[in-house]
C-alpha cells in the first residue's frame, strides 16, 4: 500500500546554482583538517577531493566535482544496518540498543561499561557492533543479503565491500575489539567476537559515491514505500529512524549539526555526510579532511550553507 505523502515541488529552487555558490564559498576551508589516519587504508586517500549530490523526491539530481567518485562510507552504513535490523526485529531492536545521544566519542568504552553493555544508540561503534551481531542472526546469508539491500537502495549492483579497508580496520581495530569483548562480557553479543567484528568492518568498508548515497537516502525521506531486497519499513519506522539520525547521527557533534544545518543525517570518518529533508530531498557530500570530532569540515560547512541559502530545514 502506497504511503500517502505529498511530494514537494522543488522546480522553483535553483539547487545547481546554490551548490556552485556553496563550493566557491567553502574554499577557505579546503586545507583545514586531515583525513582519518588511524585506519591505514583511509590514510592513503587524497584529502583534496570534494563532491556533492542532491537528489529530490520529484526525480531531479544536482551535483558537482567528485560526486561520482566512490569512497569508504564508514559509519554512514550504520543507517542501512539499523534499518535492516528494525525491519527484521521490529521494536524489539530497542531492547538491545538505545536511542539516546552519547555525548562521548564514538568509540568510547567508559559509557558502555557504566551502562552494563547497552549502547546508547546504533550509530556509535558499540551500537553498530550490536546491530551487526543481530544481523548475523537474522539474515540467511548476512554479507550477501546486506550488500543486496544497499544495492537495491541506490540502484547499482556494482556497489560492494572494500576488503582492503575491512582488513586494515580489523588489523588495527584494537579499541573496537575491546568494545566487542566488553559487549560479550555483558551478554550483549550472541555470535563469535571475530565473526561479529569482521562483519561490522565489512559493513563500514562499503564504497559508494555521493550520487549513489543521495539516491539511497531518498528512501528515508518518506516519499514512497520503503521496500528494498526484503527489507521493509512502514512510514512510522522511517520517521523514527530520522529522529535518531537527528539526535545521534554526528557522534558528539550532533547538537552542533542540528543547530547549524537543521536536518537529520549521518556522517562517517571517510569524509562523507548524508542529510535528509523529509519529503523534499536527500543530499550527500564528501571531503576527506575531518575536524577533531571525526566529521568532514567542508562537508559540515557545505550543508550549513545549503540550508541557509535555501531557507529550508525541518525547523
Regions of interest found by a model, annotated:
Residues 140, 170, 179-240, 293-296:
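Penicillin-binding protein/beta-lactamase superfamily catalytic region
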Amino acid at each position: 500500500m502506497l504511503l500517502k505523502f505529498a511530494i514537494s515541488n522543488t522546480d522553483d529552487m535553483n539547487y545547481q546554482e546554490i551548490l556552485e555558490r556553496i563550493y566557491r564559498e567553502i574554499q577557505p576551508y579546503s586545507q583545514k583538517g586531515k583525513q582519518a589516519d588511524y585506519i591505514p587504508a583511509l590514510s592513503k586517500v587524497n584529502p583534496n577531493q570534494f563532491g556533492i549530490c542532491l537528489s529530490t523526491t520529484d526525480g531531479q539530481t544536482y551535483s558537482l566535482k567528485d560526486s561520482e567518485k566512490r569512497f569508504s562510507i564508514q559509519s554512514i552504513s550504520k543507517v542501512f544496518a539499523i534499518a535492516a535490523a528494525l525491519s527484521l526485529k521490529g521494536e524489539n531492536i530497542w531492547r538491545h540498543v538505545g536511542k539516546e545521544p552519547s555525548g562521548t566519542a564514538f568509540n568510547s568504552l567508559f559509557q558502555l561499561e557504566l551502562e552494563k553493555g547497552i549502547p546508547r544508540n546504533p550509530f556509535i561503534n558499540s551500537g553498530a557492533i550490536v546491530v551487526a551481531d543481530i544481523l548475523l542472526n537474522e539474515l540467511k546469508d548476512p554479507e550477501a543479503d546486506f550488500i543486496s539491500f544497499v544495492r537495491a537502495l541506490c540502484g547499482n549492483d556494482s556497489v560492494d565491500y572494500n576488503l582492503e579497508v575491512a582488513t586494515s580496520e580489523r588489523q588495527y581495530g584494537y579499541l573496537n575489539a575491546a568494545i566487542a569483548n566488553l559487549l560479550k562480557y555483558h551478554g550483549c553479543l550472541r555470535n563469535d567476537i571475530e565473526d561479529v567484528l569482521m562483519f561490522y568492518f565489512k559493513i563500514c568498508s562499503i564504497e559508494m559515491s555521493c550520487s549513489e548515497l543521495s539516491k539511497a537516502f531518498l528512501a528515508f525521506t518518506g516519499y514512497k514505500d520503503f521496500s528494498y531486497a526484503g527489507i521493509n519499513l512502514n512510514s512510522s519506522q522511517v520517521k523514527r529512524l530520522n529522529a535518531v539520525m537527528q539526535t545521534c547521527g554526528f557522534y558528539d557533534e550532533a547538537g552542533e549539526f542540528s543547530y547549524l544545518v537543521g536536518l537529520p543525517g549521518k556522517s562517517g570518518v571517510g569524509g562523507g555526510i548524508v542529510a535528509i529533508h523529509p519529503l523534499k530531498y536527500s543530499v550527500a557530500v564528501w571531503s576527506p579532511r575531518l575536524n577533531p570530532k571525526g566529521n568532514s569540515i567542508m562537508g559540515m560547512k557545505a550543508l550549513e550553507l545549503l540550508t541557509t541559502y535555501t531557507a529550508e530545514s525541518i525547523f
